Amino acid sequence: MVRALAQGTFDLLHPGHIHYLEEAARMGDELYVIVARSANVTHKRAPVLDGRQRRDMIGALEVVDHALLGHESDIFVPIEEIDPDVIVLGHDQHHDEAAIERALGDRGIDCGVRRASPRDPAYDGELLSTGRIVDRICERRC
């Protein structure tokens, strides 16, 4: 059985997230998703929703077999526990594939790293970014 692993913040779930997870699921027989803990999200604004709520929403998706929160201090701990065959990165995630492969190798984790394709909006006004959703909320409600 091929284990695929996706990871991300998944704050304010949107069609871009669904596209990413569906594509990741097609790369394996079983999809694990690591949802970043709020305290570990340092490369962008803090999530709006609590990590447990984001994990529960991701776990409720039919395409996801297992959803879990990331480790509090070492992002590789759940990867070691899951032992995936492939890690699938989102098309716009800031991670560098080569650096991840090196770090995995240094820890004795043998798995590939692939990047999911982008998704274009299906219609005018479709928002595929949490930041854009927040901006729209502020435009209309603040």
Curated annotation (Swiss-Prot):
GO terms for molecular function: ATP binding; FMN adenylyltransferase activity. The keyword Nucleotide-binding applies. Keywords: ATP-binding, FAD, Flavoprotein, FMN, Nucleotide-binding, Nucleotidyltransferase, Transferase. InterPro entries: Archaeal_FAD_synthase (IPR050385), Cyt_trans-like (IPR004821), FAD_synth_RibL (IPR024902), Rossmann-like_a/b/a_fold (IPR014729). Its EC number is 2.7.7.2. Its cofactor is a divalent metal cation. GO terms for biological process: FAD biosynthetic process; FMN metabolic process. It catalyses: FMN + ATP + H(+) = FAD + diphosphate. Pfam families: CTP_transf_like. Homodimer. PANTHER family: FAD SYNTHASE. HAMAP family: FAD_synth_arch (MF_02115). This is FAD synthase. It comes from Halalkalicoccus jeotgali (strain DSM 18796 / CECT 7217 / JCM 14584 / KCTC 4019 / B3).
